[in-house]
Curated annotation (Swiss-Prot):
Belongs to the EPSP synthase family. InterPro entries: Enolpyruvate_Tfrase_dom (IPR001986), Enolpyruvate_Tfrase_sf (IPR036968), EPSP_synthase (IPR006264), EPSP_synthase_CS (IPR023193), RNA3'P_cycl/enolpyr_Trfase_a/b (IPR013792). This is 3-phosphoshikimate 1-carboxyvinyltransferase. One of its GO terms (biological process) is chorismate biosynthetic process. Pathway: Metabolic intermediate biosynthesis; chorismate biosynthesis; chorismate from D-erythrose 4-phosphate and phosphoenolpyruvate: step 6/7. It catalyses: 3-phosphoshikimate + phosphoenolpyruvate = 5-O-(1-carboxyvinyl)-3-phosphoshikimate + phosphate. It is an enzyme of class 2 (transferase). Phosphoenolpyruvate binds at K21, G92, R120, Q167, R344, R386. It is found in: Cytoplasm. Its EC number is 2.5.1.19.
Amino acid sequence: MKKITAAKKGLKGQVTVPGDKSISHRALILGALAEGITEIENFLVAQDTLATLNCLEKYGVRIERRDTFVRVFGTAQNFSEPQDVLDAQNSGTTLRLLSGVAATFPFVSVFTGDASLRRRPMKRVLEPLTQMGARVLARGQGDYAPFAIKGGKLRGQDFILKKASAQVKSALLLAGLRAEGNTSVTEPQLSRDHTERMLVGFGAKIKREGLRVEISGGQKLLGQKVIVPGDFSTASFFIVAALIVPDSHLIIKNVGLNPTRTGLLTVLKEMGANIQILNFHENSGEPVGDLEVKYSPLKAVEVPPEIVPAMIDEFPILAVAMALAYGESKVRGAEELRVKESDRIKSIVSEFSKMGVAVKELPDGFIISGGNKILGTTVDSHHDHRIAMSLAVLGLTAAGTTEILNADAVAISYPEFFQQLTKLTEGA
């Protein structure tokens, strides 16, 4: 349990957030598949990324880590058969991306995860991998971990996804890297494109036309130096905290600003947020900059479904901004939130309601009437890191103490979150 009290002062000064989780995962995987050595700076050290690292080591990949510096000794796409089950723990990225890799090898890989991950749907990845030629045996009519994959000679396919998903797209591109012929993925909206950018950075040739991306099989990857920017999803908690705590003026340094990730900035600015981008530049193929955020009175907003993929991880913290905004805000087209680490729609509705927020559940989103007094009480993260951090930020504006059960879930992506929040709000 973690106790949060109202912020004693505005959030001021500068803060640096840990390395991007999505890019850290992909740097490990592409480095393992490449020829030569890949060096990763500012690697995110958290439960999810370490799950990927541990799985790769079970494939026989040699990896050296010294704090946030990682050296991966590439295998030139020659993994060894794992002698043990591959445990993705709570990480959907680990499970889905490595499924695409596993489908290319002529041996059996057995995957599992924690109780939460074993409830998350996998058919959206496993079915297309089967169409490419992999053999898959999965629990729950082919939809859930644990599952086994025996790969081999894959055939390139053209896939049209019903829902935009960076994890599904990435798994299919990684499988296509070793398939015969070309593999293409077309999405209804553009999801985050770190995999495409990084494949190019590692020497692969891909074609990108609008919502379609295509990769040809048989390509080699070459080890690279990857400098991981700060994680925008992690920065979002401090962005919203600075917007809602009076007298705040915060600069968040070196944040990844990939346009497929920053839908939250668009929505917050529509709500009246005072956010400026400073020192904009590119690093390892990714746009990066500093964010200057000042306290801002916010007004309600309706989030259009087409922007959902560009902010899929930020809805819990957006809900905090909506709770403090004037008027009625609405989110639609976000049913994907129901199959995250928790059912995030239900988690937002149940826990925010306890704190006095007027929130209504929709099948694919929620409605929040902002402006109610926020009340400190006991709430539950539902073992979801983003729910835990969002409740903590909401607690900064609450009357009384907010007690968060299962707050240790933050270790999944940001183990030092509460220490950093305390420094910013109490001047420690």
